[in-house]
């Protein structure tokens, strides 16, 4: 998953102008797609309480920072942002006005009370498993409490979250995220997710189908199923049998209006036969798979507790490409894990050459407090990490540009997602996730049109519409 920083657009605003005394919320989202989804669901719960969204903290009554804890310096980024908000809160107080500040997400879960100690201006700390309690927590804040909600909830948070209004969902576009699984039981030694998101939990088929049908009814054409280990999803199917993600995808493909399906992020150990069959048989399932491996060295994979070997990963890729020859792969890589030798790194480079990725994320290892990796000796020098990362990224970039160039001359169906920057221009999404720019002023957002790729841009494709 990427670690972009986004904010929730003011999609919950009513069609009519809000009253002058309406409370406004600004939500800033750091991190992965699951945080984007979580921010939207928090916004939905606040909309039910009368809040409307704003695209700036300057006129917000409530500012929520939905945080990520995967990368190094996540906490420093948070406290820097809180420092800026403290000045804003002090200025409001001088004018007799209030600003409520909340911290949500994985840093909130990891640090809890420590956030209140370091940033006394914060009013609310709420973890990712308890944001269904957000309205109640805010009521307690208005009563004068400083609130920390980071206990893992016994109740199912999704059962307690209000469904977004149809007009609000429409404003979010024709592509949507849908969380189907949370948490992780793999305990990779470098990763904080099991400690911030908890153990693996799968949403019920009934919940997922109902939410997907609501999204489709609101005009959504493409669904991306989300989970920390999304292909670990399982549950009782409508036929009474135990379903895996493959069976779930077959069920969602039957929903009228849903034209494209995707899922992320996957673990190699959970790619089962039914899921591979879905890639073979479902035309709605896009030929793009994010399948992190982290290293090409068996020795490092063992130290990371990945519980598979490099050749097992390569054989899995071969199986998938045998049933879906046009499959494009993306991945995640960590360089400089404790004990990584030159040969270990060269093994990673060779695996990258063998797979030939369409796109991948790569990072220097940074120890995360509380993880087993943080206690390992034989740390790699920063200069060595830097040199290895540069080499790996150069190879991955070359593969990415080669993949984009291979699209030139190809014909494909593209889902139109939004107007482009130029008049009459539209931006769509290729089956392989790349943005596609088309000079077209007749079709509408949500239409699927047939195009030919004529050139490439920076991380995008340029296309002509075909009759």
From Swiss-Prot:
Binding annotation for [4Fe-4S] cluster 1: 32, 68, 106
Domain MTTase N-terminal intervals: 23-143
SUPFAM superfamilies in UniProt: Radical SAM enzymes (SSF102114)
Pfam families: Radical_SAM, TRAM, UPF0004
Cofactor note: Binds 2 [4Fe-4S] clusters. One cluster is coordinated with 3 cysteines and an exchangeable S-adenosyl-L-methionine.
UniProt-annotated stretches for the region Disordered: 1-20
Family note: Belongs to the methylthiotransferase family. MiaB subfamily.
Protein name: tRNA-2-methylthio-N(6)-dimethylallyladenosine synthase
């Amino acid at each position: 998953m990427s670690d972009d920083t986004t904010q929730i657009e003011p999609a919950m605003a009513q069609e009519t102008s809000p009253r002058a005394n309406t409370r406004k919320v600004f939500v800033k989202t750091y991190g992965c797609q699951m945080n984007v989804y979580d921010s939207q669901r928090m916004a939905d719960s606040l909309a039910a309480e009368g809040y409307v969204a704003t695209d700036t903290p300057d006129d917000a009554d409530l500012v929520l920072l939905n945080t990520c804890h995967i990368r190094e310096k996540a906490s420093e980024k948070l406290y820097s942002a809180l420092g800026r908000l403290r000045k804003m809160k002090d200025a409001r107080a001088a004018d007799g006005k209030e600003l409520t500040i909340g911290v949500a997400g994985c840093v909130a879960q990891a640090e809890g009370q420590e956030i209140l100690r370091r940033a006394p201006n914060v009013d609310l700390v709420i973890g990712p498993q308890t944001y269904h309690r957000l309205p109640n927590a805010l009521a307690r804040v208005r009563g004068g409490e400083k609130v920390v909600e980071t206990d893992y909830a016994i109740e199912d948070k999704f059962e307690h979250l209000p469904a977004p209004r149809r007009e609000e969902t429409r404003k979010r576009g024709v592509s949507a995220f849908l969380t189907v699984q949370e948490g992780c039981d793999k305990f990779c030694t470098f990763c904080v997710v099991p400690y911030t998101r908890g153990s693996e939990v799968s949403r019920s088929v009934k919940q997922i189908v109902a939410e997907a049908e609501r999204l489709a009814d609101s005009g959504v054409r493409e669904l991306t199923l989300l989970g920390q280990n999304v292909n670990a999803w399982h549950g009782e199917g409508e036929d009474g049998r135990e379903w895996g993600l493959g069976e779930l995808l077959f069920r969602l493909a039957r929903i009228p209006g849903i034209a494209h399906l995707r899922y992320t992020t996957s673990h190699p150990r959970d790619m089962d036969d039914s899921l591979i069959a879905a890639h073979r048989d479902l035309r709605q399932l896009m030929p793009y798979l994010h399948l992190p491996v982290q290293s090409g060295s068996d020795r490092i994979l063992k130290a990371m507790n990945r519980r598979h070997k490099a050749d097992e990963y390569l054989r899995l890729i071969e199986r998938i490409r045998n049933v879906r020859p046009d499959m494009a792969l993306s991945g995640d890589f960590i360089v400089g894990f404790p004990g990584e030798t030159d040969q270990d790194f060269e093994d990673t480079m060779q695996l990258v050459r063998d797979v030939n990725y369409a796109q991948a994320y790569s990072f220097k290892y940074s120890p995360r407090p509380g993880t087993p990796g943080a206690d390992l000796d034989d740390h790699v020098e920063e200069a060595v990490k830097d040199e290895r990362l540069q080499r790996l990224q150069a190879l991955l970039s070359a593969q990415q540009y080669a993949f984009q160039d291979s699209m030139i001359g190809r014909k494909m169906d593209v889902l139109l997602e939004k107007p482009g920057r130029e008049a009459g221009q539209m931006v769509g999404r290729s089956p392989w996730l790349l943005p596609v720019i088309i000079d077209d002023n007749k079709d509408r957002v949500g239409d699927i049109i047939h195009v030919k790729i004529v050139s490439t841009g920076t991380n995008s494709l340029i296309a002509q519409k075909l009759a």
